[in-house]
UniProtKB/Swiss-Prot annotation:
NCBIfam families to which the protein is assigned, alphabetical: matE (TIGR00797)
Family label: Belongs to the multi antimicrobial extrusion (MATE) (TC 2.A.66.1) family.
InterPro entries found in the cross-reference section: MATE_fam (IPR002528), MATE_MdtK (IPR050222), MdtK-like (IPR048279)
Domain of life of the source: Bacteria
Protein name, UniProt field: Probable multidrug resistance protein NorM
Membrane topology: Multi-pass membrane protein
Any one GO MF annotation of this record: xenobiotic transmembrane transporter activity
Gene field: norM
Amino acid sequence: MATTAPPNGKWRRLFALFLPIFVSQTGQYAMNFVDVAMSGHASAEDLAGVAIGSSLWVPVFTGAGGILLALSPIVSHHFGAGRHDSITRAVAQALYLAVALAVAIVLIGAAAVPFILKQMSLDENVRHIAFHYLRALSFGIIPLFLYSVLRYFIDALGQTKVTMWITLTALPVNMLFNWLLIYGHGGFPRLGGIGTGYATAITYAYCFAAAAFAALKFRRLAPYRVLVRFYRPSWAAWKELLKTGVPIGSAIFFETSIFAAVTLLVGRFGAETVAAHQSALNFASLLYMIPLSLSMALTIAVGVEAGANRYEAAKQYCLIGITLALAVAAAAALFLSAFRSHVARLYTNDPTVAALTGKFLLYAIFFQVSDAIAAPIQGALRGYKEVNAVFWSALLAYWGVGLPLGCALALLTAAGAFGYWIGLIAGLATGALFLSFRLRAVWRRHDSGRAPCAF
């Protein structure tokens, strides 16, 4: 059974988990930025094609990939309880499930993507680039999902530095193949934005190969013999993964898709408003990397303690994580209050767009507070395997409160496009409040020794 850290040591332990995860998440964000920036230097049509393709791919990956995130609390529970053979078995079954999910996405995408693109009012060349970008990227979906499984296995054992280094080394790989395939250097064909898809697929394959090497060779990972010991596919094991993973993946999909929906709805207010909205949302997403990384670290820490039946220690990690997130949110809010105009000018030289971006960033301040509460609690509840509450929170808060309220304010009042952001803030706050009550209920249940509830 894994040992717990003393109360003061829990701060250091959580930070040691958080920092590499944060670097990894920021590295992934940087790869997306590089793809867009390098495509834009090819042509405006290449940039548009990659942007359209990416907007279709990201919600699918975050939703389907979120199913595999179930492996993290499962492994951390086994690790906390000292069930090491069960870890190897769970990883093997997750690898099988990853391949099945990836194949399903490729087959469904092959049929659905042409139809979806035809329904969009796109220039024919942009549509061509978007389709072939996604087709090129599809060659990397199986390696990406296999890498996701190995990453969650490695992270759940507390070895988050391994995936940090994989991400950091993947960034130059991605940049190199973008340079070769987008612009046609080194004897490669000049593919423009389509080359971004192939470069991304190659980067996914690199990440899987690097994670496989680490799993086989690193001292703290090799004893589990993943990729060496084989088991028959087990529906019972898949059922456990899906029971935990489908609510997680659905919650992530609801969260990512609401922002995509709002971006489409803001379009009615003109190009300048869309540009300002997208710029402010981009920066807010960058700041969100901090509470998101804390959330992932808490899933691991709480999962280990819950697996070992040390519920008081798990509660201490929850309180530490929320405290850290609130402190960071306060700092981010002060930064945005003081420097929002400077941030806006990083995105545009147009004074009208910059002024609008600054106003949107004022609303982003309220994002920080809600995210600082909701994100760590989401991670903690996943660590407890309390995933249904996270699912219902995302569905009701974003689509039941946030979007309807945002539409009403945007279309029926003078708030305009800012009404959508007010709706998002209300949704985030509702979700944070709901999750807070749910976490307190989990604590009370474990204090009294009652059985878990379905909701």
